[in-house]
Amino acid sequence: MRDTVKIDKRGVRLIAHRGLSGIEQENTCAAFIAAANRESYYGIETDVYRTSDGKYVLHHDDRVCTGAYIPETDFDTLRAVVMEDKDGRERWDLRVPTLDEYVRICKNYGKVGVLEIKQPELPVEYLREIIDIIKAEDYLDGIIFIGFSFEKMLNIRKMLPDQTVQFLSFDWKDEYFDMLVRNGIDLDIAYGALTEENAHRLHEAGVEINIWTCDSAEVAEKYIGYGVDYITTDILE
């Protein structure tokens, strides 16, 4: 039986990366519910794409296992794809979820949704569509938006001045400090790129820090010592 790795969180908020992806197939309702059923997780992270017919689905890569390119494929075709479980066997319930299904799971279980905007070229009107879907579920207050495109995070900040928004980055550049502080945007950074000095400096300026993707208890302990606010993980609990 697969199981999580237990740690002493000491108040750090754990985010289940693509759902509880260390146990269930990533970015499926099964993975979301596996995380939702565990009190240890503050939030559930996922990735959103727009299909060719204007639906919003959750998947990490831009192609599903059949090779279909999500932005150029209609929803019904994507939904018909049956994914494999962790053991390599197909499981009929493992299908590409929709954004509204994910939001409902987060809302029903009282978890924060951490939603990565995957398409850097996504027009502002499509960002509004994503926001409207979440509003229709009456759960905008329960969502954190994240993304590697600072421009897209700025777009969301302008549309939703009070929303929690995190800029994703593989690395640290000195110019990020002013960018984040000036625009009220938090940092979601690959853990190896975060120094203790920068963590303290960001916190003093009111910027929250999320690190990804940390699956080592020893590494987590180090960054908990830095005072990070969130740890995104596949398996730590």
Locate predicted features.
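Phosphate-group recognition and catalysis centered on beta-loop-alpha active-site segments
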Residues: 1-237
